[in-house]
Design a protein with these regions (language model features):
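Conserved small/polar residues in nucleotide/adenosyl-binding loops
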Residues: 2-8, 247-251
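Acidic/polar loop patches that form or flank catalytic/metal-binding clefts of enzymes
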Residues: 1-3, 16-17, 26-31, 85-87, ...
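Catalytic cores of secreted or luminal carbohydrate-active enzymes
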Residues: 7-57
């Protein structure tokens, strides 16, 4: 008799931690079909990136410049408290487009991805510092396992934002898309800051820039049989979590 093999399959895919909570939150705010009954405020106690401090900080003069291989984010951080000195960790998040191509080919995208961060020096009350953070363009790539079978960069609009945490980042991006607490009937937890958002547009789907490694070797699928949906013994039996339908995941 042949051996019997068993394995555990985690259906969440990329939607673990903040990538799930913030993606579903954005879908609820935007009224995306099948987002379901989900309340971010009663689900998440502290968002990814959250930190306490004895003082407060404000961001200003947000700017992003593009070079051939990277984006450079610059912003001014000011200690707005009156008593305590402190350091601030500036976090940079981006959102990539979730396109028809992605949906057709089983590619998933989170509402926000951390792509860079930097910590200021100790700032006295009222003091400021300009922070520079470099984000390599490779951060924008997504692996397409089903069609291109290599890394791609989707066509569409990419949003970059400086934020205090992942939830703040998504609210900033939602604000840049025109959403507010008022026009979403309170589905949005707070208004975002459009002054801390920059949009970059990729005109065409790119399937070549990140399709080879540093040594020139082609990057492509090697172990398709490890995917239960591509295995000859159990094809198509696993439904991965996707914003297209949250119905098979409960909290």
């Amino acid at each position: 008799l042949g051996d019997v093999y068993k394995r555990q399959v985690y259906q969440e895919g990329i939607y673990l931690g903040y990538r799930y909570f913030e993606t579903r939150y954005e879908d609820v705010v935007m009224g995306t079909a099948k987002a379901g009954d989900y309340n971010w405020a009663t689900t998440v106690a502290y968002p990814f990136g959250y930190g306490d401090s004895y003082t407060t900080f404000a961001y200003s003069n947000f700017n992003v410049t593009e070079s051939d291989d990277a984006f450079t984010v610059t912003l001014k951080v000011t200690n707005t408290g009156k008593t305590f000195s402190g350091k601030e960790t500036v976090q940079i998040y981006f959102q990539s487009p979730y396109t028809a191509y992605d949906k057709a080919n089983g590619i998933e995208k989170a509402a926000a991805e951390l792509c860079g961060f930097a910590k200021t020096d100790v700032l006295a009350p009222g003091a400021s510092e300009t922070v520079n953070i470099t984000v390599d363009k490779s951060e924008l790539r997504t692996y397409d396992a089903n069609n291109a079978k290599t890394y791609i960069v989707d066509a569409g609009d990419y949003y970059f934002t400086a934020a205090t945490d992942s939830h703040n980042a998504v609210n900033n991006i939602l604000a840049a898309k025109g959403y507010t607490v008022e026009n979403t009937n309170g589905r949005m937890t707070e208004d975002g800051n459009t002054d801390l958002v920059w949009k970059w547009t990729n005109d065409t789907l790119d399937t070549t820039t990140f399709s080879t490694g540093a040594n020139g070797t082609a990057i492509t699928n090697l172990f398709d049989e490890a995917d239960p949906n591509k295995s000859s013994s159990e094809p198509g039996e696993v439904t991965w979590l996707s914003p297209v339908s949250y119905t098979h995941l409960t909290l």
